[in-house]
Amino acid sequence: MEQFGGPSGFMPPASYTAPLGKYPTKQPSAAYPSDGGRHATKENPRPAEGQASRQSSSVPSAMASKPIQDPEGHSAQPTSSYCRAQTPRSTPLPVALDEEARLSQYEVIRQIGAGRFGEVFIIRHKATKALLCWKLVFYKGLREKEKKQLVSEVNVMRELRHANIVRYHDRIVCRSRQCLYIVMEYCDAGDLAKQIEAAHKHHGGIDQDRIVLVVVQLIHALAYCHEGVGQERRRVLHRDLKPCNIFLASHPEYPDDSSRCIAKLGDFGLSRHLNMHSMAHSCVGTPYYWSPELLEDGQKTYNVKSDMWALGCVIYEMCTGKTPFAQAQTMPQLKERVRCGPVLPVPGFSDSLNALMASLLQPNPNNRPSALQCLGYTIFRGCSYTPPPLYRSSSAPSWTPRNASPARGSPSSAVSTVSTVTTSPGSSSRTSFSAPSSHDAAASSPASASASSRYQHQRSSSYSSDSAGPSGASAPSQKAPGPGRPPETPSRESFDLASKARPGFFAEAPPPHAFAEASPPESHASEFLPPANGAANEARNERTQRDRTRRAASATAAAAVSAFERQQREGRSMSPDPSAPLASIEEEEEGEGDDAGCGSLGSGSGVTRRMPGASLNREDRREAPGLRHADTHKRDDRDGAIWTGRREEAPFSRPGSELARDFGAASQNKVDTSRFSGASSGKPRPGNPQNEDRASFASDTSARQTVYLSGLSRRCSEPPAAFHSAVSPWDPAPPRLSSAASSSSSSRAVSPSSLRRASSREMKYPTDDRPAVAAGSSGVALARAERGPEPGAPWGNEETEGLHVHGRPSAAPASSFSSERTSRPGHPDEARESEHCFQGRGRFAEAEASPATEGKDPRDSGFEERSGRRDEGRTDGGEAQSFGYWPNGRSDEARDRLGAPSVSPFSSKRITRRSSTAAGLSTYASPSDPAPSARAPAEWRRGAAGSSTVSAAGACGRFLPSPRSWQGNEKSFPSSSDHPSAYPALPHPAAPAYPEPGAQASNQFPRRRQSAFPSVKRLDYEEEHASSACLPTLLSPRFPHHPVSRPAGGVSPRSSQRQALAPTLAGMTFERRLSAGPLSSAPFSAPQERTTRLVGHRHALAADAERAEAPFSHAFRPGHHDRTPVGARRVPPRAETPGVSLDPGFRTGGPLDRGPVGSGGLEGQSFDFAHPTHASSEKKEAETEWSNPTAPVFYSPRSPRNDLPPGDGARSPYSAHLRPGVSEACSSFSVPPTERYEDDKNSHHAGSGGAFSPPTFGSPTPGPVPVGNERTFGRNPSPAATCASFSAKTGLRTPAPNGLAGDSGAFRSTNSLQRTPMSRRVSAPFGAGSAEGATAFGSRYASSGSFSKKFPQGSSSGVHEGGGAFGRRQEGDVSRVDAHGSVSPRSFSFLQRSDAPLSRGQPEGSHFQKHGETRASPDFARKGDSTQTHASGGRDFSQSGPFETQDFTFGEQPTRETRHMAPSPRGIERGGPQGSFVGHDTSFSVYAPRAGHAEGVESGCSAFEAPSESLSRRDGEADRENTVPNANGQMPVSGMPASKQTYGDDCDLYDNSAWTAQKHAPENFHAAVAPYPSSLLTGFAEGQQKAASRSSCLGGDR
């Protein structure tokens, strides 16, 4: 009867029109009822007052006849505005009625369908007016097999009692007519097949949220059947699961809302009981839903996994509108297609849903998950559905029918009250329903009933779980007036089971829908009929149902463990997937007190900071006005000896997600609890959803030394032995006290969804290497929990989170704690990834040990919290926000309110910055580093990358916060001003343009770069670690040593041997900088800032030197194109010593007053050129950088991964940066260096040993104005050894919303992006002379093309309180790692400010254009090379528009390089037009050579590459070239038609409309590069099938 709806098929009512609306992403708190029903209508009236139901039948009621279950504390049914048909419930008559009398109890309404065995009718129970349906089957003409099948259906249905299974009520055998009446529940919303057809025909498909809701109900029903039903605990196989056998019933609370239907499994005519280990041996059901074991000729045995296969087919049909194998017309075709499997993933749906379908449609039934295992999948973790028990107990509160008038004794005001606890605006809310007792009915009012029963509904991109606050206490529920009982709380046992079955809820909060039992009121007991098996069986079945629910919940975790053990038996690897896209940048800023400042345990303070939310995806932008947040404080001053705890809730207030955590610290034998939890929003990924860690701070003699671990960790970490000591994770443990034994713990976790394994290990040492003052007075506890994605899975939204808590409590000497939480939300739609990191660190100082705390509270402590965000496109840096805080005895509330400055009771000791590069190659050092020189010391060439500098600054009077802690319209922070101010205010328009001499700078914005702790007696220690994006390397803070990469001797990132190589340790560099200029009061007249900077050098081998920079300011002068930059200055060195050079610094800056109308954009450019101090045997690096302040973001010019041309899968929004420089590593300075500076023209300078031809800086004005601000630089320290290298980078990064979106994510089709010719070559020679097997890797590439697209600027902007000023601030940092022990600067900052009080909508813009000339560089030619031509082409950079959008137009001529190189693993090769070219060169070391992907060009492009050797070392020795062909056996070529070139002074863009390129990536693409890291190539593999049928290229048309 599958062609009809209803329980056995029926047609939907004529009034039903719109099938599937969009599912709400958050389900109502009211659970799905065990039975469904409709409103009382004229056709379905209610019984009159006093009308007694007939007690002459044992037939149960209709679908809607039983009230919904009442949860403990969360009533499942708000009866405020809903009156359902009353279920007849009473004891049966002692005298049985005959068949005619039983049939006369029902009134036949109409026929709704017909099937193989009979007809289906809607009927009404005359006594209760409840709508039911019966299947009328004439068994006279049935064969014996069909009769057995009919009896089987009745026998199966009578034992099934589940909210998501069509309810069986009674059977009536009419022997006079030789027919059987099967009375069952009536599902009024039709079957799923018709809903799918109508949705895909008229509405474009079904929303994923609704699919998830239907599927989770079906899984609950199948889990109920497969785990065994009845007294004999026999499993039930449906054997005919398909959409037309899945029926939909109206929700009892929302009968007119088709989007909230309840899915019910029906038509068990082909079902069969199955013993625990038996098999069924018949092929029944629809062939399109048959599993592979059913289609095999010789194998027709199957078990419950066949139903799971059919469920996967149903999910696929809901997503696509057709069965997975609908193309098959014959049985052999069907077998072949089933053998090949369906086409997955289904586009437009999340990875989690596709993963569920892929696991259900596994050909091997042993690999398919069971129904219980499916409940652990990530896609269901936010789904709030839980099936309720079917029956109520007599102990539950009574209920009053809805809409009964007060005169009838059923006041309409007798409603359940809705209590909603909302964490924050826009965040997920918890709705609980408390059912009033019969005494409350009379006291309630209809108005309150209507208001309180409103459904709390919100929409977002996915489901999210409701959770209580971190403390586990929920807000009190609202209760109806009167002496009604409060809502009951579920037991701990029931919650523990529920949390196991549905991970995602916190262990201290009840599940959102914990169902209890309730019974109907005794006054209406006469209106109800009992089930067929009587009251005794009903109670027994009720207990059985609860027991089954507990067993099913516990089986979820057991299933995961079983899968884990099976996976372990199969010998699968426990190590992380090396190709997983784990590339990340982590910046950690740690503030630690001096040892002398340690004191007794004191009180702490908490400052709640806003967690910066990631960008909204498209759906969020459409449905949510923006991100909101709510911050709360909770102080707990328990006594003077215990540190004050705090509670922080920092929710992502995007609809449907929240994060909360508790922080606290205590003295010895006290417990510090740290917990965080998250509900994912967007596209979830596999991974455990929550962690809870409890670390006990106990004395040394205590036995509690356990580390609690939970969650799925894809990292194997070995923390340092002592957290605050600079010890490598891989160095031996420091000496420990003999009385304290070390302990270690390991944990392994498995994701129930992915069945992938991972492990983590934590080493814990009870004491550090410092002796304790007294026995038992010192202890340490370490707790770490990480929740991460499974290895190899793509990034999802807000998925990865980790928590690291470390404490060292003590009663007397010193106590400290630290915590770090990192979350990495990814944005697949935008091919970006962000990272949020919160760190807390404190030390409790003694009053007498620290002069800064004199007269202060001895319990003063410090806390610093940092949050950062990283975009994947800017792989070498990121944005960060930090907020540091040291109280001086005043209360938190007063300080926060006044924003008063405070003095740190201890000194900031160090800053540690760790960075993992995202180049995608297994490297010793950053891709920006040159290859090691043969003359370099062995320690350098060993690859122990990372260098350190130590600098000291004079004592400042006050603590200054990091500039990254500021954002518009944020909370106040301690400033350097003597006057407290809640917000930094803009100056009055009448304020002077320049501050008067001696004027106090107040209300200023902090404008510091780089340093986050300009505090008292600052001593900064900087250390940078480089890491591979893919494989464990020597310097990765996250991974242990790789057996191949670990050198002999155990060189560590913090090795003293490495630090001894830094000559600058012999001296110090100090810098003091004050930004005291007021902001401008008008866009075009007032100066922007004023800066005074004093920089000094103190070197052991040289005289002290100081230089001061004059105040610098610039203003806008619109309409004048011939202005030259102002504010330039050059400061000579103060002293020089033979053998040590203190190079001069040069800095120039000023406005770029261009544009025909003077848009008023805040512009400027800056050229910084400064050499660090150096001595012999020291590598020196000098770099000049140009940054356009109007470019909102930045990227490192030294990383080939970042230098992607426009349209080349750009991963960051947009940026522009130019940074040429010179890198040297020489043994001695036997000959004075040769340096030249020239301005205002293009020139080429060569010293005696080398020639350098950097790109030139363009003129700030177009046209015939001479080029200004050019810098060319040549340096030859030693004529005997050519050991200098040059690198220069230019580029503009633009996003491709519709284009190929990044090299570690899925590639996307290009819609309107113009084609961008590009030529790039990467050479990977074998490193014969390199140490430790590292090979040199040279890269030369350039780009050309055009791109014009509007997109959001992505800056933080806001209106300051108290005024209409509109400002914006952007800042970024880039870290560069040096493998040669360089002491040159390794990072730079980029800052854009537009703080002028412009009105909303005020446009701003800038324009930059550079010109150059062609010149040959014969000194760069090597053996086998033909000439190389390097030249700079034209470049246009412009932006205009309102604050929210920016327009960019970019054009650059390509590069022609006559070098034969291996394929590029970073992008698709392109051809470009002939003409002037510009070339770029960089080199870095790698573990092994790596072949790239296959690339080519269309016909019409001529190849011009000639075989040659590639040099990546500058010591005169050539490495062997790696000429490994690509996967297609081809060498990449690029060319261009001679006619495609257009040049002009205005740098017109050439016509590239006829250009295209082909991506040739064979199916064995991954196999071709299997030995090498492939995170950069994952996007090609994922997009292979999509790209097979179209011409796909970076920037090309689809």
Swiss-Prot record:
Function according to Swiss-Prot or TrEMBL: Probable serine/threonine-protein kinase. Involved in controlling centrosome splitting. Promotes separation of the centrosome outer cores.
Domain of life: Eukaryota
Keywords from the UniProt entry: ATP-binding, Cell cycle, Cell division, Cytoplasm, Cytoskeleton, Kinase, Nucleotide-binding, Serine/threonine-protein kinase, Transferase
Activity regulation as described: Phosphorylation status of the T-loop (amino acids 267-293) modulates kinase activity and subcellular localization of the protein.
Protein name: Serine/threonine-protein kinase Nek1
Result after altering T286A: Abolishes kinase activity. Does not affect subcellular localization of the protein
Species name: Toxoplasma gondii (strain ATCC 50611 / Me49)
Reaction(s) this enzyme catalyzes, per UniProt: L-seryl-[protein] + ATP = O-phospho-L-seryl-[protein] + ADP + H(+); L-threonyl-[protein] + ATP = O-phospho-L-threonyl-[protein] + ADP + H(+)
InterPro entries attached to this UniProt entry: Kinase-like_dom_sf, NEK_Ser/Thr_kinase_NIMA, Prot_kinase_dom, Ser/Thr_kinase_AS
EC numbers on record: 2.7.11.1
Gene disruption phenotype: Conditional knockdown results in severe growth defects. Defects in centrosome outer core separation. No significant effects on the centrosome inner core splitting.
